[in-house]
Amino acid sequence: MRPLRGFARTRRGIAHAVYFADLLRLAEMKRVAAQVAEHEPRIDVLINNAGGLFATRRLTEDGLERTFALNHMAYFVVTEGLRERLLASRPARIINTASAAHQGATLDFDDLQSAKSFGAVKAYRRSKLCNILFTRELARRLDVEAVTANCLHPGFVATRFGDQSGGWMSHIVRLAKFFAISPAKGAQTIVYLASSPNVAKTTGQYFYESISAIPSPAAQDDQAALLLWQRSAALAGIPELP
């Protein structure tokens, strides 16, 4: 809560609201999306920026592996829950935080929950590939004149990411942060995608340092993007929309 109190002190007079949810639970994602849609008259920008790295494989109450649930399904469910509000707010923008860690990752659609083979880094890399494929399919389904969807690699940023990963993973992440960039620098591409007129009609792209970049071949697979969307909708119990 300290960062929120700091925001309130430095942004006096600017209306803002805070909504809380457990990002590992599908029901919570649906609830908070419905709550935001009900109370916010318009949404100009949606930034999906949740993420985690877990040392051990555990399932959520929905039967989803935690990395997949937090890093991908949370994005999917919240975005779908806010789709109508975003369309009504046109022009609007959706920004998904991905990562260069997707490079070299592949998806096994017969094992999205990593039951056959789990590794903390492997699961994380897969989830970041999901972010890019989700963005790609989302952009295909949205009218660029109404809502754009892009994703980005922010760089390795010195935040609290990974602090609660558990076991040896937490120690490795903490040590690596000595070489990380500042949160302000890590936010630059997000701010650019959220506000720059240069990308007002750009959609379905992957960015790094405010420049459109080429993701891995696996991240450019339109069939995989469609299949991931269909599987995600089924897992979340969300009707297929065009």
Language-model regions, residue ranges each:
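Short alpha-helical scaffold segments that flank and stabilize functional sites
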Residues: 3-6, 36, 134, 138, ...
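A glycine/serine/threonine-rich, flexible loop-to-helix segment
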Residues: 158-174
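Rossmann-fold NAD(P)H-dependent dehydrogenase/reductase core
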Residues: 1-160, 235-242
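C-terminal helical subdomain
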Residues: 127, 151, 173-215, 220-226, ...
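Extended hydrophobic/aromatic segments used for targeting, binding, or gating
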Residues: 2-3, 20, 29, 169-172, ...
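Short, flexible, mixed-charge acidic loops at enzyme active sites
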Residues: 107-112, 164-167, 206-207
